[in-house]
């Protein structure tokens, strides 16, 4: 019985570790995707591809809604400061601000007004920078 408990404990630890690694890799991939979307939007503004801009805003908003779930305790990694888990409420509020700014970008794209779109992109980028200043190490 003692060996069964020990084996079960070791397996649970390994599974948790593998799960954390998966969460870390997935969140890194989503952040890279956001960067790619924002870069693409710069090109799409010049082309007048408003549907693509709106879709990009929606995609970023969808990630922002899920983002806090990808930072469970124990998923510390290079680049993520401990401040995320120390002040998780602030981290969550910054994710909400990111979501709201992304939805504003989506709405601005529907107006087809480049000025509104650029203002929305700047606001969205500001929410990214705000979070990075507080919670990203590099």
Model-flagged regions — what are they?
Residues 1-7:
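Bacterial N-terminal signal peptides that target proteins for export
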Residues 7-14:
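Bacterial N-terminal signal peptides
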Residues 15, 122-125:
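Processing junctions and N-termini across compartments
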Residues 21-123:
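Extracytoplasmic c-type cytochrome modules immediately beyond a signal peptide or single-pass transmembrane anchor
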């Amino acid at each position: 019985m003692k060996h069964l408990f020990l084996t079960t404990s070791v397996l649970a630890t390994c599974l948790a570790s593998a799960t954390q690694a998966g969460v870390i890799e997935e969140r890194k991939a989503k952040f890279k995707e956001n960067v790619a979307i924002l870069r693409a939007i710069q090109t799409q503004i010049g082309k007048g591809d408003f549907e693509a801009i709106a879709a990009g805003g929606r995609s970023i908003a969808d990630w922002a809604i899920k983002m806090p779930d990808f930072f469970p305790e124990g998923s510390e990694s290079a680049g993520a400061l401990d401040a995320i888990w120390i002040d998780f409420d602030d981290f969550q509020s910054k994710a909400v601000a990111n979501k709201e700014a992304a939805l504003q970008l989506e709405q601005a794209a529907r107006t087809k007004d480049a000025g509104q779109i650029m203002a929305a992109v700047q606001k969205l980028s500001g929410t990214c920078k705000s979070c990075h200043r507080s919670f990203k190490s590099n």
